[in-house]
């Protein structure tokens, strides 16, 4: 990880605090993982404040596979089975079956429809009947211990929401370059500068939690 590129966003703790402040005000953050892991950066928004314009940005600027990060108890409450019984993904990414809101959507693929699906899944009264499958939103189940258990974007997303005092649900999508290749840290920083966002890393979040005993 090129720490020099990250210095403009502050120290390890400052980057996390800035990210939390952004999420509390409905803004997005960019989270990078290690170069020896996925070596990717994800654009992340709080699920409870997500807007169609923010969803459209994710669809336009990112991979298009918009994921809803959920803690295990919410996955269970919604009755979502895992996508496969035996996960052979290199990173062990815990996809459930994809979802669509049962009501209030058309084809489910538009930005507004995907936001509606996210809202249906995180509603306080949400139940299995509130959703249909398959759909155009891809839930991910976070490990219970967060980034201290698994250093993935899924866990970082849920941890950030909890630390920000928000509902523990977040939406992410991998940032891509205009040619379709994956954005690495230099491109992530450039995107952040152009869109007035902050960048932090999964390792920042690990250190923050460990230092504060969270």
From Swiss-Prot:
Residues given in the record as D-ribulose 5-phosphate binding sites: 37-38, 42, 150-154, 174
InterPro entries: DHBP_synth_RibB-like_a/b_dom, DHBP_synthase_RibB
Sequence positions that bind Mg(2+) 2: 38, 153
CC annotations in GO: cytosol
Necessary cofactors: Mg(2+); Mn(2+)
EC number: 4.1.99.12
Pathway(s) per entry: Cofactor biosynthesis; riboflavin biosynthesis; 2-hydroxy-3-oxobutyl phosphate from D-ribulose 5-phosphate: step 1/1
Protein name: 3,4-dihydroxy-2-butanone 4-phosphate synthase
Protein's organism: Nitratidesulfovibrio vulgaris (strain DP4)
